Amino acid sequence: MGDGIAIANEGGTAEGILPPSLSGTGVFCRPASGRHRQKVEHFMVARTTSAGSRQAAIDIRPSLVEIRHAAAKVHSEIRTIPIYRELLADLETPVSVYLKLSEGARLPGFLLESVEGGIRIARYSFIGSGDYASIEMRDGVLTEGNVEGTTTKIYQDPLTALGEVLATYKAESDPDLPRFTGGVVGYLGYESVRRFEPRVGRAAGDGLGLPEARYHLADTLVVFDHLQRSMKVVSHVRLDQGDLEASYQAAVDRIDAMTSKLHGAAPSYDLNPATQCLPVVDRFRPNTSSERYREMVQRVQKYIGAGDIIQCVPSQRIDIDTDAHPFTIYRALRTVNPSPYMFFLDFGDHHIVGASPELLVRYEDGIITNHPIAGTRPRGETPAEDVALGEELIADEKERAEHIMLVDLGRNDVGRVAKSGSVRVPRLMEIERFSHVMHIVSSVEGELRDDLTALDALRSCFPAGTVSGAPKIRAMEIIAELETDIRGAYAGAVGYIDFAGGMDTCIALRTMVVKNGVASLQAGGGVVADSSPEGEYAETLHKMRALVRAIEKAELIEQTQLDRSGGTHS
C-alpha cells in the first residue's frame, strides 16, 4: 500500500486514495456544520505510509472519547453509533469504487446511484461489498447468514421480521451524515403482498425461483458525495457488546479494511467469450405469447365492464440468454437509460440490475413521500418539439384521468399511516423530463404517525398502483389469475432501510434479473376500458427496450475488449 492522501483531523495521519505524485502536506479550512457549527474545522492533507492502522484511527470521527460520551446519553434502544473516515474522491467514480470493494465484481455487494435528477436525488451514491450478513426470506422462513454460520426463523410478515433484525442495530439519525449510513439493502418481491393481504393469490408458475425478499445487512459502506467529490467510509460501533473500546476498534478495523481496498487500482473482472450467434431480439423467450397477452387485456376489460376494477396492469416476462457479465450490463444500462434510481445488487446466485424512474416510498425526517407517475411521451428532437410534446401530454384527458386515479391511490396509501390531516399533494401533474422520455409526475406527502415506523409506511404503499391497478386488491387478484408466473423482484421494492429508521425505495421497473446466464426482463401495461390489446402488448415491449439495448451494448463492449486483449478480462 503506497503513499496517498486523505481528509483528516488536524495533526492526524491517514491513508487516502490519490497517487503519490499528488500527495503532500497542507491545511485547508471550510465552514463547519451540524455539531461542529461553533468552530472551523481544520483538515490535514497528510503523507502516509503503510504504518500501523491503529495510529490512523485519529482521522476517524467521532473519536472514542466522543463515542463514550454519546453512549452515556442515548436511549436504551440504541444499539449502534456510526463512525467514519472521509477521503478525497476526485479521481474516483461509483463504478470504480464498486470494482475495488468487490474485488472486480467477484464478491456480493450493491451499488445504488442516481445518474439523473436534482441535487436531492443525485448528490450521493451508496456502495458496499464484502462478507455482509445476508437476509433471505422464502416460503415463510427467514435465513440470516454470515461468516459464523446461519440462523433461521419462521415469519408471517416479512417486514415485521425485517424490523426485528434492524432493531438489533438501531441507531440515531446523525444530521452531519448523509441519510443512509448503514442498514439493509435489497429487494422485497411483489408476491410479498400476500403476507399483508391474504385475499391476494399468486400465479401458478415460478420461472425464476427467487426468494420472496433478499437483503444485504450492510454495517460498513462507502457514501460517495458527488457535490464535494469526497467519500465517507462508514461503519458502526456496537453499544451492546460490553467492551466499548473493543467495539470501537472493531469498527475502525472494518473502515481500515475498506479504505485499504480503495487505495489500489480498480481490478479487472472476468469476461466470457461470446457464444450467442443470434441478435438479442432473436433470443427472446417470452413466458406469454402475444396472443395470450391480448387475451389477458380483453379479460381485464371484461372485469372493468363488470365494475370490478377501473384499471389493471398485467405484465409479461422475456428471458434472454446472454454471456455478458451482469456488471457490464449495469454499466451499459446507466448510459443507455440514466434514471433517478440506478441499482446493481449482487447476491451471488443472482443479480438485480435496474434503472427505475419511480420512487415507491421514502421516509425521512418524519415525512412519508410517494411519487405517482403516469403518462408518458418521448423527448422531442428539438426544444420546440419537446415543449409541444409536453403540452400535448398534459392536455391528454385519458392520461390525466389515469394519473389522478394513481394520485388518489397514493393519498389513500399514505393516509393509512399518516397523522390525521397531514396528507398533502405539494406537486400535482407536473411534467418531469428524463433522458429519453417525459412523464406526468405528482408528489404525495404525509407525517408518519408516532406509533409507526418506515416499515409500516412501506407495507401500506406496497405494491404501487402503477404496477397493480385500482382498486388495488381486486386488481392484484386478477393479476394472479391471469399471469403465467409469479413476478418475483419485478414490481416489488428496491432500496434501503437505515439503522436509524430512514428508508428510500423505488419500484422495480426497467429492471432485470440475471441468473445462470439468463437475463429476465418484465413489463406491464395499464389497461383501462378503451385500451387497445395490440397497443398494450406493444407498450410492454417498448418498456423493455432500454434493457434490451443495455444487453446488446454490454455484449458488444465485452466482445470488443476480448478481441483487443486476446484475454478474458475487462
Language-model regions, residue ranges each:
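Short linear motifs in low-complexity or flexible loops
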Residues: 6-8
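Extended alpha-helical targeting/anchoring segments
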Residues: 45-570
